A protein has these predicted regions:
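Non-catalytic terminal/accessory segments
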Residues: 1-410
Length: 410
């Protein structure tokens, strides 16, 4: 329990329906742990409902999270610590999500290797609202394969059915294992391990990260057969539905996996998926909107750079540099656009451009050209006034430079 407590305190996070924070957890345990422990051992402990939070999904719609109370988070973390070693050794080598020492990077590299080996068609399967649609009986039957303690089985089921509070009302839950608690990722892997074992038994090459599963085959016809048969397996065995609108049998370079895509060449180089670029641009625009009126250097240091650095770190596996060069240029243009807007009057623009080294004639022509901020931010006069080095001196990082730090010298 002490290890679970340390993990909960380290991860912090928002409070549940009781409003208690992780900083208040130790004091609560000092007062109430004896009673809580007794009810756990007696098999009578009743979790509180989770707090519902809806967050936007990158492709539209929302993802539903269920935030447990900090006490329930502690108990779930302890359960996770006990169950994880029991299952971990039996999980598939092709499963990468929510597992110790594994992650998205390994999954992406494994997917690339499958394509490079000649499997140049992908069965891209999207499970419809997976975390909201998990059948409790099917899941608990899988858990019971390795857990015989009826108290623990009952406690896990009560967590699954603990209800969800939204707008002051508690909704009963008959299905799903909402994301937000420590147990949910492990339970999802326990359920989908049946899928992994089925794919392995059939000899399929696949990569699965949580509910994101790609199967690699050598022809469209083979992919269509796999899509149909695996969809039937999921429906009949696990009572899960494949989202046909978001699933497809397609070339890997026309799909994305964990934010990445591939080039169509034989080498199948990793690249940033188009949608991932769009999402970054949307986030950058949000930062610019929230940072309007702030000192530019402070905005770059505190708001822009952390976002760019995290994005570059994740996509450092990309083997094509063009997208990073294009984004670097686009970000500088956004900054030039901000500065042009700040110079509201033509006379101010003229004076600033002169100070930045433009000739009198060129500064006048630019200041009174009547064009909009975005056009001017891409025009030569502002590129001369604000070259890349100007923003570098303000502390702006380069996405290309950041990712190149991870690239091996050729």
């Amino acid at each position: 329990m002490f290890r679970a407590l340390a993990a909960v305190e380290r991860n912090a996070g928002a409070g549940g329906v009781d409003g208690r924070s992780t900083r208040q957890l130790r004091a609560h345990l000092h007062q109430h742990w004896t009673q809580t422990k007794a009810s756990l051992l007696a098999g009578t402990y009743q979790p509180l409902p989770v707090r519902r939070v809806d967050i936007p999904k990158p492709g539209g719609g929302t993802r539903m999270l269920g935030i447990p109370t900090v006490l329930d988070r502690l108990i779930q973390q302890a359960i996770h610590q006990v169950l994880c070693p029991i299952w971990e050794g039996d999980f598939s080598e092709s499963s990468y999500g929510f597992r110790p020492g594994r992650g998205a990077r390994q999954a992406v590299k494994a997917a690339q290797q499958q394509v490079q080996s000649g499997k140049r068609w992908v069965v891209d399967m999207d499970l419809e609202k997976f975390f909201d649609r998990v059948n409790h009986d099917v899941l608990m039957a899988r858990v019971a394969r390795k857990v015989q303690d009826k108290r623990l089985l009952g406690l896990i089921r009560r967590y699954l059915q603990s209800g969800m509070m939204a707008g002051g009302m508690v909704e009963a839950r008959s299905e799903g294992t909402p994301q937000g608690g420590p147990m949910s990722p492990l339970l999802s892997n326990i359920l989908l391990d049946d899928l992994d074992k089925e794919l392995e038994a059939r000899g399929h090459a696949f990569c699965r990260y949580a509910d994101d599963c790609n199967i690699y085959v050598r022809s469209r016809r083979a992919g269509q057969r796999v899509m149909a048969s695996v969809s039937r397996f999921l429906r009949k065995r696990l009572r899960l539905k494949v989202n046909e609108a978001k699933s497809a049998v397609e070339r890997p370079w026309k799909r994305k996996f964990l934010g990445y895509s591939l080039t169509h060449h034989q080498a199948a180089k990793l690249k940033v998926a188009v949608e991932s670029v769009r999402r970054l641009k949307d986030k950058v625009k949000e930062r610019f909107g929230a940072g309007r009126g702030r000192n530019l250097g402070t905005f770059i240091r505190d708001d822009l750079n952390p976002l760019l650095r995290g994005w570059a770190n994740y996509f450092a596996l990309s083997e094509t540099k063009g997208v990073f060069e294009e984004l670097d240029g686009w970000i500088r243009r956004k900054l030039r656009c901000v500065q042009w807007r700040q110079w509201k009057r033509p006379w101010t623009r003229y004076q600033r451009l002169r100070k930045l080294g433009l000739t009198d004639g060129r500064a006048r022509e630019s200041a009174w050209n009547g064009r909009g901020p975005w056009w001017n931010s891409g025009a030569s006069h502002l590129n001369v006034a604000f070259p890349a080095g100007y923003y570098q001196r303000l502390g702006l990082i380069s996405l290309l430079t950041e990712v190149q730090r991870f690239w091996k010298p050729t």
